[in-house]
Each structure stands twice: as C-alpha cells, then as structure tokens.
Amino acid sequence: VGFVIPVSVLLNFIFSGFSIIDFKEIFYTSFFSITLAFTGAFFVMLVSIFLILISNYKSNNLQKSIIFLASCGYALPGTILAVGMVIFLGWINEYLHFHLSYFAGGFIVLIFAYIVRFLAVGNASIRSGILKIHPNAMDASLTMGAGFFRGVKIVIMPLLLSNILIGGILVFVDILKELPITLLLRPFNF
C-alpha cells in the first residue's frame, strides 16, 4: 500500500497530461549541485591529503591530536554546523571589523562548512592508502636526494591515486546528500 498508492498517483499524473516537470530548471539546479559537490569534494580531498601527509611524515603528537580533532566535524549535525558557521562569521565581522557580507551567503562559507563536515571521510580514505605504503618508501626518495615535496609528488601521490579518487567520490556523494548545510548557507538566488 505504501508503494502502490504513490506510484499509481504519479503514473496518473503522467498519463493524464499533468506535468510539473521543467527540464530547464532541473538541468540548471542539477548543474549547480554537481558543480558545488565537485568543488567541495576537491577541496576536502586537498585538505585531507595535506593533513594526512603532514601527520604521517612531519608531525609531533600535538599536531596529530589537532588533526584528529579536525576530523570530528562528521559527528556534528549539519544544521548545528551551519548555524555555528553563521555565528562564527558574525563574530569575525563584529570583533575584527572585517566586512564579510560578501561571504555570508556565498560559496566560500559553504565550501568551508563542507570541509569541516566531511574531512573525516577524506582523511579515512587517505589514511588507509598511507598505511599500505611502506614507511621506507619516502625515506628512500629522501636518501636519493629528492626533497620532501618531490618525494611526495613522485613516490606517494601515484600510490595514493586510487584512494584519492575513491575518497573524492565518497565526499562528492555525501555533499550531494547534505541538505541542511546547503540550504542554510547557500548563496542568494541559488
């Protein structure tokens, strides 16, 4: 009954000629949703790569603890995080006398909220890839004269490529599903 009645009503709308479908509007909103999710996933994975590489190769226990705390945003509800972002922006605007009205309903705040929310997903993907790499791989590149960044580029990044792509897909899908943050922080006329 819970399936048959809604499907029969929808089929009745289709066959009776009642159409609420506006393909131009659907394409427009789908394009912006996919663009926003792709941009958010890109920045989440970029920050995740940076944090995990630093925590694995160049950090002490305090830095590792801070990076662990950065991953706790996934436990917060999206609505609480969005309201917290608005309060944080208001605090910055009031006390530091920045004019952040351009950012208050913009993509920058939305992307930052996505980074805070989904950093745990990106970190988990990158960390699982880092754990598969032998610890001496980076040391070998440093011994052969490559600097840290060149060693990361030549040795680590090719080995992490599949984890980066999988983590990016997971974050992309999570951002597409995240309605509270998007609805509360979206730009006007979006």
Predicted regions and their residues:
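Membrane-embedded alpha-helices of multi-pass transport/permease systems
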Residues: I5-N12, L46-L51, I80, V109-F112, ...
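Periplasmic/extracellular loop-to-transmembrane helix junction in inner-membrane transport proteins
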Residues: V7-F43, K58-Q63
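Membrane-interfacial helix termini and adjacent extracytoplasmic/periplasmic loops
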Residues: S16, I20-Y28, N61-S65, T79-V116, ...
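Short hydrophobic faces within alpha-helices
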Residues: S30, S55, C72, S128, ...
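Transmembrane-helix boundary motif in ABC transporter permease subunits
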Residues: G40-A70, A137, G151-V155
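Transmembrane alpha-helices
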Residues: V116, N123-I126, H134, F148-K177
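Glycine-rich helix-loop "coupling/hinge" segments at transmembrane-helix boundaries
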Residues: V173-F190
